[in-house]
UniProtKB/Swiss-Prot annotation:
Belongs to the RapZ-like family. NCBIfam families: PRK05416.1 (NF003828). InterPro entries: P-loop_NTPase, RapZ-like, RapZ-like_N, RapZ_C. PANTHER family: RNASE ADAPTER PROTEIN RAPZ (PTHR30448:SF0). GO terms for molecular function: ATP binding; GTP binding. Residues 310-353 are annotated as: Disordered. HAMAP family: RapZ_like (MF_00636). It comes from Sorangium cellulosum (strain So ce56) (Polyangium cellulosum (strain So ce56)). Keywords: ATP-binding, GTP-binding, Nucleotide-binding. Coiled coil: none annotated. This is Nucleotide-binding protein sce5766. It comes from the Bacteria.
Length: 353
């Protein structure tokens, strides 16, 4: 049985019994180190950027003492005395650990273009201006990093890679065993246009062309989570056609958004008050797409619990009991969903149109 000192000296085993993994991300400035670190974070790595080489071993040991077995470290020429301490620092953490050095590079032309687009100076540019000074910085950085490049476990040329491509490559090459590739999280939000559109929506669909149950006796105080409202809306051929066509569009788009590295997708479906038509169609589309795409989908009915003209909170009662995915927060008109409306404020004027 090893004591705490042995554990620190020989590293910490992961949940599967494998040695802890430390990925050191380095390379040319502008080659994509930040993107690579973000990809590691998506894989569950604890990442620290711009770490001085003298703190590499203490940082790794501190993480392991807290039970962290996947660690990402970003090191570049902006760190003082980089070359002097890099070799010793990396050697100090190799024992008992799976240490990977990821070196990122790109063509001089590509690096210059990226710095020009971001309007940021190269970290080694100490004087002069324009492309000549920038190129001098790139060439000097290549020279300084030559010895570390020779020690790299993985070398990636990002010249022809977009940020999404680089993220995908890093995940493919460095994903630990038993760790799933991060999947895009999709959220469907039903809402009422009279209260404003969801500010975080990527896609919006307007279903106010359908007949409104608000004007049907016995349906006004119900919501789209109640079966009578659902039956009323879905007996309309236009509603079924909308579901079919929108499902085809989203089943085409969603996997492609996910493959491009998009982490979140918010789809808004709106009617006038957000209590009837949008709720029914949001439920129908999300259920179908969840089965077809296999992507995680959550549902929020933002305005389903707003107060109707009668003063009775719509949807409150037997029809709402246990309704899945219902957000019962009462938001102020024009406010974001994170700003709850006081429960005592039930003033809503005017009926639906």
């Amino acid at each position: 049985m090893s004591n705490g000192g042995d554990q620190q000296q020989h590293g910490l085993l992961g949940p599967d019994g494998a040695p802890g993994r430390v990925v050191v991300v380095t390379g040319l400035s502008g080659a994509g180190k930040s993107t690579a670190l973000h990809a590691l974070e998506d894989l569950g790595f604890f990442c620290v950027d711009n770490l001085p080489t003298s703190l590499v071993q203490p940082a790794v040991e501190a993480c392991e003492s807290g039970g962290i077995t996947r660690i990402g470290l970003g090191i570049d020429v902006r760190v003082g005395s980089f070359l002097a301490g890099a070799t010793a620092a990396l050697d100090s953490i190799r024992t008992g650990r799976d240490v990977v050095i990821l070196f990122l590079d790109a063509s001089d032309e590509t690096l210059l273009r990226r710095f020009s687009e971001t309007r940021r100076p190269h970290p080694l540019t100490t004087g002069g201006s324009g492309a000549i000074a920038m190129l001098d910085g790139v060439l000097l950085e290549r020279e300084r990093l030559a010895s570390l490049r020779a020690r790299a476990t993985i070398e990636l040329d990002t010249t022809r890679l977009s940020t999404h491509d680089l993220r995908r490559v890093v995940i493919e090459r460095l994903r630990p065993a038993r760790v799933e590739v991060p999947r895009m999280s999709t959220r469907f939000v039903s809402f009422g246009y009279k209260y404003g559109i969801p500010l975080d929506a990527d896609l919006l669909f307007d279903v106010r062309f359908l007949d409104n149950p608000y004007f049907v006796h016995g349906l006004r105080e119900l919501t789209g989570n109640d079966e009578p409202v659902r039956e009323y809306i879905l007996k309309n051929p236009d509603a079924l056609e909308f579901i079919c066509r929108t499902e085809q569009l989203l089943s085409f788009c969603m996997p492609r958004y996910a493959s491009e590295g998009k982490s979140y997708l918010t789809v808004g479906i709106g009617c006038t008050g957000g209590r009837h038509r949008s709720v029914v169609l949001t439920n129908a589309l999300s259920d179908s797409l969840r089965r077809k795409t296999g992507l995680p989908i959550t549902v929020v009915h933002r305005d389903v619990a707003r107060v109707s003209t009668s003063g009775v909170p719509s949807g409150v009662g037997e029809g709402m009991a246990g309704a899945p995915g219902v957000d019962l927060r009462l938001a102020q008109p024009g406010a974001t969903p994170s700003e709850p409306r006081p429960a005592s404020d039930t003033s809503v004027t005017g009926g639906e149109r």
